[in-house]
């Protein structure tokens, strides 16, 4: 365990509540606590046993008679704590004043206010967790759905770490074979045994296959972690706001028969079978002289560029006109779903021949709810092949994805060099680079500046 000073921070959200927790971590936690904590039974805090709790008061450091708050103090002895250090947690009354008053006394008694993510950083530096597990902690905190929570929990338990360590083991074995082959050629001045080259190639190809398997769900993983950005577009009065209300199951957007009612962007979040989805209802796209509506139309066009998925709504009770065609041309090279709305009406006029060049067409009625479930299933098909597993490892972190691609690229370069009969010393450079890239995921190979940046994005107290 590394030696650090003693740090403290509020570990619970600031605000009114039943209980707040002040976390203290470091060698001197009991010594600091004994200066400001008075147990009801006159117990010697510095001899407190691990995994026990004591009831008492936090008192003013300079005036022991002044009670700051009534608290419960718990102790976890190193190394069996979150940080791997001695940890004390003070459970005080929730509330801004009471919590900050207790924290002030802890600081006066000798602790330093922790930096963002410093507790988790210490857990990493003390070997309690690796970097991928540390990042999973933040993902758990920010999870938007049960699925994203489960994905983060699987990673926090070391599932990704296990895969990465296995891959590094394969590549380490490849390096050992290369070193043996190099020594063999130096000693015997002979051509390397073909079987040895075959073993080296097999080791690299096996690694490539496993990396590609991990990367196969990376795009879906990003959506599980960060959410899917869906933008609803179409002409005015085709039913975009009605669709938003149907998906939200509440009247969030104003719905009228007057074209151009929605002049600004409306953004809402829904849980689509575990997928966090941000749905944006845009202003109807059309040529207009209205200054305010024109701004809304420009915003709509900007949102189209940012979307993961575009939902184009067409009014099935009208003929497709030039404005519809312009919108169709704008989205046809993107991932999209076309909704033919108002299919509950008897007079359907939309021209089928114009739709022949479009795919993913669904008949719906935003008013009655017809086709809404089909729409949800189609979204899942487009991004998850219709199935989302909550039990398997999902690569959801962009940094992990980038490192895996870097490792894969170096492995492929190594194979190319082998097939070109290049020197084995040159091939070992690519294998070493591939191992280094994998080590960036677990933190075994990472610059301190990048480590500091990763942990700085955590909240204070975690």
From Swiss-Prot:
Kindly name one Pfam family recorded for this protein.
Answer: TrmE_N
Molecular-function GO term, any one: metal ion binding
- This protein's record includes keyword Magnesium: yes
In its keyword annotation, does this UniProt entry include Endoplasmic reticulum? no
Report the top EC class in one word: hydrolase
Q: What is the protein's given name?
A: tRNA modification GTPase MnmE
Residues annotated as signal peptide: none
Species this chain originates from: Clostridium beijerinckii (strain ATCC 51743 / NCIMB 8052) (Clostridium acetobutylicum)
The UniProt family comment states: Belongs to the TRAFAC class TrmE-Era-EngA-EngB-Septin-like GTPase superfamily. TrmE GTPase family.
One cellular component term from this protein's GO annotations in UniProt: cytosol
Q: How is the cofactor bound?
A: Binds 1 potassium ion per subunit.
Q: Which UniProt keywords apply?
A: Cytoplasm, GTP-binding, Hydrolase, Magnesium, Metal-binding, Nucleotide-binding, Potassium, tRNA processing
Give the residue spans that cross the bilayer.
none
Q: What is the lineage of its organism?
A: Bacteria, Bacillati, Bacillota, Clostridia, Eubacteriales
Q: Where is the TrmE-type G domain?
A: 227-384
